[in-house]
Design a protein with these regions (language model features):
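Active-site-proximal substrate-binding groove within the catalytic cores of carbohydrate-active enzymes
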Residues: 132, 162, 167-188, 245-247, ...
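Acidic/polar residues at beta-strand termini and the immediately following turn/coil
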Residues: 1, 48-50, 392, 404, ...
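Short acidic, gly/pro-rich beta-turn/loop elements at beta-sheet edges
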Residues: 37, 68-70, 83, 286, ...
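Aromatic-lined carbohydrate-binding/catalytic grooves of carbohydrate-active enzymes
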Residues: 219-371, 384-389, 395-407
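Carbohydrate-recognition beta-sandwich/jelly-roll modules
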Residues: 1-276, 281, 300, 316-319, ...
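Short, low-complexity, polar/charged sequence segments that are solvent-exposed and flexible
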Residues: 47-53, 77-81, 294-297, 339-343, ...
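Short C-terminal domain-edge/linker segments immediately following a structured domain
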Residues: 88-95, 103-106, 306-309, 351-354, ...
Length: 593
């Protein structure tokens, strides 16, 4: 254990490298000592400039891993970025996006999942810094076992951000690449559009318009109000969520017939377009016994009651989808077999009992597509016609790795298996959703549970760690539908404004599965259902117009972060004033080139 620096190498050589596409410096590091003995460990770095673009590539290349067990490689290091000026700022893709001026008064805390790419800590594998209109974009070309770390003390005067690489199945194993693009006269819009161009070059940009050619029901989802409800909650006594002091809080049940009546009521109240996301619909209850989740909850009405609810939804032209889960692997599942749980290189199998279902490990994602096919066939066999399906945590939590020889899996392969689950649903005409959004999922994910700003996941009133900016939407607004929290937290903070600014879909009602978790806080202004419907209609009407449009620009009006404006590719703009708690929607007839 401990830190080893590049300059600790006993032998370091450099050579100039010229190729047909650029030139750079190849450096070789070897002769590292451990307990006084020279180890065979050896690696190279290649830093080169691409002639056609001027982009700078930094490559870390393992040659021999014998002798040292490397846990993390911190390279390239952070840029020098110290001056207490608001025009010097850092862009992080922590959830929807955050802009940290060097003058920001709040310290930046460690992001969720420690800033690992492919998680909620980094929806996209890049960061950027801009100083007085000049900046750089750092893209991790090999993001699967990589992340970032950032440091900004309260009040500045600096922000440091850099890449790190981590092992895959216990070894560094493969070449790691970071690409730097340097820009003049740039801002966060330029940065995001530069990254979008990169994604398009890779063939990974897939718009909703393109997806709707294969699955036309996408057009029906655009403009819907989102309704998040549940059927059965059962908290196992050995779950961390179990409350022995108040056992009546642990379990509750709502019948399918009751939910059906609520749908009828919403229709009578004038709700025209609606999507119902249904939790806890199966016999075990929410977050229990996955992946063996059926049958439909008998106490709530069974398959017959569930089918009646679905048929009523379809009678009104509404869309229906279920919550499902193919990562959490519960020991209570009848088919549970430790041989198919994710196994670490040291032979251990991670376990916890955080959620309602109690003790669990993680299902190796190589198995997930098979369980998806099995379970969705059972739903189809019972006449449940699904429009959508939510596969929990796939786009929020890190990819898993598994070292079981029967189904060895890298993190990169894990993301590919998760995408296979989405693709299977698309083939069946079912629109796939997951918890949040992520760069790796854009080609196959249609919508999400939410894609919030990071501050929305902390208790109301917690100081913001930077200025919330829609970095993800500046890249991918026209690719993935995102419903937004609509809570009015106080007279000074209304999440509806963020929903409008982002051109997203509204939550009509969002019943969180766990109290004070995942942004579902009780501290908010109470509203009647009529008020919620009225507010959701405003957001739905806007989403109907801009849901398939690119967000072409985001700005601070007259440089004021409290007054923000977005412009979409069809000319519609949204301006919100967070101080006055007002919004304005206009058609500026602005078209992107």
């Amino acid at each position: 254990s401990g830190n080893i620096f590049f300059h600790d190498a006993g032998e370091i050589t450099h050579e100039l490298l010229h190729t047909g596409v650029g030139e750079g410096i190849l450096s070789t590091y070897c002769g590292f000592k451990k307990e006084g003995k020279i180890m065979p460990y050896k690696f190279q770095t290649l830093v080169w400039v691409e002639e056609a673009t001027g982009d700078v590539y930094c490559e870390w290349i393992p040659l021999c891993e014998e002798g040292l067990e490397v846990k993390k490689v911190f390279w390239p290091g952070p840029m020098e970025f110290e001056e207490k000026k608001g025009s010097w700022y850092t862009l992080l893709t922590h959830q929807q996006g955050i802009l940290i001026p060097n003058t920001w008064e709040v310290e930046f805390q460690t992001p969720v999942f420690d800033g690992m790419f492919g998680t909620a800590g980094a929806y996209m594998p890049w960061f950027a810094q801009v100083r007085d209109g000049e900046g750089y974009l750092a893209v991790c070309v090999t993001p699967w076992n990589s992340g970032y770390q950032a440091e900004h003390p309260a009040g500045g005067p600096y922000t440091r951000v850099s890449m790190r690489f981590e092992p895959s199945l216990g070894k560094m194993d493969y070449r790691r690449i970071v690409k730097y693009t340097f820009l003049k006269e740039c801002d966060h819009n330029t940065i995001c559009k530069t990254y979008r161009n990169y994604v398009e070059e890779q063939g990974r940009l897939r718009t909703l318009a393109e997806k709707a050619i294969r699955n036309p029901s996408i057009d029906r989802l655009i403009g819907c109000a989102f309704l998040h409800k549940g059927i059965k909650t059962f908290v196992q006594p050995d779950s961390d969520f179990y409350d022995p002091e108040k056992p009546e809080k642990n379990n509750h049940l709502t019948t399918f017939a009751q939910r059906e009546q609520e749908i009828r009521q919403l229709h009578e109240m004038g709700v025209e377009k609606l999507y119902l996301h249904l939790d806890g619909w199966a016999e075990p209850g929410y977050d229990n016994r996955h992946p063996d989740y059926g049958p439909a909850c008998k106490e709530a009405g069974g398959w017959e009651g569930m089918k009646s609810l679905v048929d009523t939804m379809h009678k009104y032209g509404y869309l229906f989808g279920i919550h499902d889960q193919y990562r959490d692997y519960y020991l209570s599942a009848p088919s549970f077999d430790e041989n198919f749980a994710c196994r670490l290189p040291d032979g251990t199998i991670p376990r916890h009992k955080r959620w309602a279902g109690g003790p669990q490990s993680y299902l190796c994602a190589t198995q997930a597509p098979y369980y998806v096919k099995r379970n969705f066939k059972a739903l189809e066999d019972h006449g449940i016609r699904l429009d959508c399906a939510y596969l929990d945590v796939f786009t929020c939590n890190e990819g898993d790795e598994c070292d079981n020889p029967l189904h060895r899996m890298t993190r990169k392969e894990c993301y590919e298996h998760r995408a296979r689950c989405f693709q299977y649903l698309l083939k069946k005409g079912i629109l796939p959703s997951s918890e949040e959004v992520n760069d790796w999922a854009v080609t196959s994910q249609v919508f999400c549970h939410y894609a919030p700003y990071d501050f929305m996941m902390r208790a109301p009133g917690t100081p913001k760690q930077g200025i919330p900016v829609p970095l993800y939407n500046l890249v991918y607004h026209d690719c993935v539908i995102q419903p937004w929290m609509m809570e009015k937290i106080s007279e000074e903070e209304d999440y509806m404004l963020y929903a409008l600014l982002n051109g997203g879909a509204p939550y009509l009602v969002r019943d969180g599965a766990y109290p004070n978790t995942d942004g579902a806080f009780e501290d908010r202004v109470e509203m009647t259902l009529e008020e919620c419907i009225t507010r959701a209609k405003v957001v739905s009407d806007l989403h109907e117009k801009v849901g398939k449009c690119q967000m072409v620009r985001h700005e601070f009006v007259e440089g004021n972060p409290q007054v923000q404006k977005t412009v979409f590719s069809n000319g519609i703009s949204v301006q919100v004033d967070f101080q006055k708690q007002t919004y304005e929607i206009r058609n500026e007839n602005y078209f992107s080139e």
